């Protein structure tokens, strides 16, 4: 599960997703942990048009009514990432998986490898591809 991610768009540019041109402003977030709960750049659907924007990185269950409940729920479980294998049966994701999808912008992410009880971060990126997308809800 990638909880640590980065994105870099060095200058204003137009990207294409399918046939849709999308204007992106410069972005430079070298490393961010999902556990910081900061906004993250995404492409989201508004009136059948993909638009860039910042969104909260965490799927908040629909039964959470306020900030205090959210903080308490984080102590019990995390909803930063939802595995695709169970997305249609996951109680938290079921309510939004068909209607609230987005593309999470990324240039790289980090996975950890354990060697002799020591964990080491590995930066994973796509060669010759400065920007890619991860499915999000």
Predicted regions and their residues:
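Short linear sequence motif anchored by a di-proline
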Residues: 1-137
């Amino acid at each position: 599960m990638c909880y640590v991610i980065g994105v870099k768009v060095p200058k204003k540019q137009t990207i294409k997703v399918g046939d849709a041109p999308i204007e992106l402003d410069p972005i430079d977030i070298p490393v961010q942990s999902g556990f910081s709960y900061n906004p993250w750049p995404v492409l989201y659907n508004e009136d059948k048009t993909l638009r860039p924007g910042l969104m909260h990185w965490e799927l908040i269950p629909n039964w959470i009514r306020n900030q205090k409940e959210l903080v308490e729920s984080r102590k019990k479980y995390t909803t930063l990432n939802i595995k695709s294998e169970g997305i249609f049966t996951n109680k938290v994701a079921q309510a939004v998986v068909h209607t609230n999808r987005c593309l999470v912008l990324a240039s790289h992410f980090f996975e950890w490898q354990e060697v002799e009880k020591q964990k080491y971060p590995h930066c994973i990126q796509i060669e010759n591809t400065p920007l890619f997308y991860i499915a999000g809800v």
